[in-house]
C-alpha cells in the first residue's frame, strides 16, 4: 500500500515553490515494486501529486479515495474501475484488509474555484494482525476519540505533525495536539508525519519533531521517527536515532 504518495520534487502547482528539503530525496518510483493499492486522504498538492500518479497509475491495482477525489484520477487517465470512493464512516474490503474512511478537520481544493468540491478523510486500515490509523491532515477535535472508540485501539498511528500555525488551528494540529490525538485514537505506537519533506509553514524544520518528542515523553507515548526510506517493524521497532540533528 502507498498512502498519499508525494514522490515529486515540488508540492505546489509551480515547480520553483515548496521544494524538498535537501537532506533527502524522495524514493524513486521505479524502485517501489509490487504496489497493490494507493490510499489518498485529500486533493492538496502535497498529498495528491500529479506526476506521481501519472507514473503509478498503470502499476497500481486500485485507488481508494474520499468522495469526489476520483474525478482528478479519472481526468489523469486512471480507469474508473480502479477507483473506489468512500464517504466518512464508509467501509470496504481489499485483499483481506478492511478500509474505513474517517472524519478529519481539513478542507480540499487545488485552485481558487474548486474548494470543498471533494471530500477529505483520515483512514483506518485493519488486517488480520495489525490495525493502522492514518490521520491525513486536519485540526484537533473530538473525532479522534470517536474514531478510537469505533475502530481502535491501533497498533500503529501515523499522525500529522508539521506545517502548522496558531492561526490555522482548525485545519492543522500543533505537535502537542498530534501526540494527544494519537493517544485519543488508541495508538500504541505513534509516528509523526507531514514534517520532514517540505516547508509549508513558518516554523523551523526541527520544531515539529522536537515538540512531538517532548510531548510524547510527558504523556509516556511510544513513538518512532524513521528517516525517509527506512524500513520499520512496528511489532518490534528499534529505537530511532535523532537523525535530524545531523543536518
Sequence positions of predicted segments:
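Pre-active-site segment of Zn-dependent metallo-hydrolases
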Residues: 1-43, 50-55, 65-68, 109-115, ...
Amino acid at each position: 500500500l502507498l498512502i498519499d504518495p508525494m514522490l515529486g520534487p515540488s508540492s505546489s502547482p509551480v515547480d520553483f515553490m515548496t521544494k524538498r528539503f535537501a537532506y533527502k530525496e524522495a524514493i524513486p518510483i521505479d524502485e517501489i515494486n509490487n504496489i497493490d493499492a494507493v490510499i489518498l486522504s485529500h486533493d492538496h498538492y502535497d498529498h495528491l501529486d500529479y506526476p506521481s500518479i501519472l507514473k503509478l497509475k498503470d502499476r497500481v491495482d486500485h485507488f481508494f479515495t474520499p468522495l469526489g477525489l476520483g474525478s482528478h484520477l479519472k481526468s489523469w487517465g486512471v480507469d474508473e474501475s480502479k477507483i473506489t470512493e468512500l464517504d466518512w464512516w464508509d467501509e470496504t474490503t481489499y485483499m483481506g484488509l478492511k478500509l474505513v474512511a474517517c472524519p478529519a478537520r481539513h478542507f480540499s481544493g487545488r485552485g481558487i474555484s474548486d474548494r470543498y468540491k471533494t471530500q477529505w478523510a483520515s483512514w483506518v486500515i485493519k488486517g488480520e494482525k495489525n490495525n493502522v490509523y492514518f490521520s491525513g491532515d486536519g485540526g484537533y477535535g473530538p473525532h479522534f476519540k470517536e474514531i478510537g472508540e469505533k475502530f481502535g485501539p491501533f497498533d500503529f498511528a501515523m499522525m500529522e505533525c508539521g506545517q502548522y500555525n496558531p492561526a490555522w488551528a482548525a485545519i492543522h494540529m500543533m505537535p502537542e495536539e498530534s501526540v494527544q490525538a494519537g493517544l485519543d485514537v488508541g495508538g500504541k505506537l505513534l509516528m509523526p508525519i507531514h514534517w520532514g519533506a517540505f516547508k509549508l509553514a513558518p516554523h523551523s524544520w526541527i520544531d515539529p519533531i522536537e515538540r512531538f518528542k517532548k510531548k510524547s515523553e510527558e504523556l509516556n507515548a511510544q513513538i518512532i521517527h524513521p528517516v525517509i526510506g527506512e524500513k520499520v517493524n512496528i511489532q518490534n521497532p528499534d529505537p530511532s536515532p535523532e537523525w535530524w540533528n545531523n543536518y
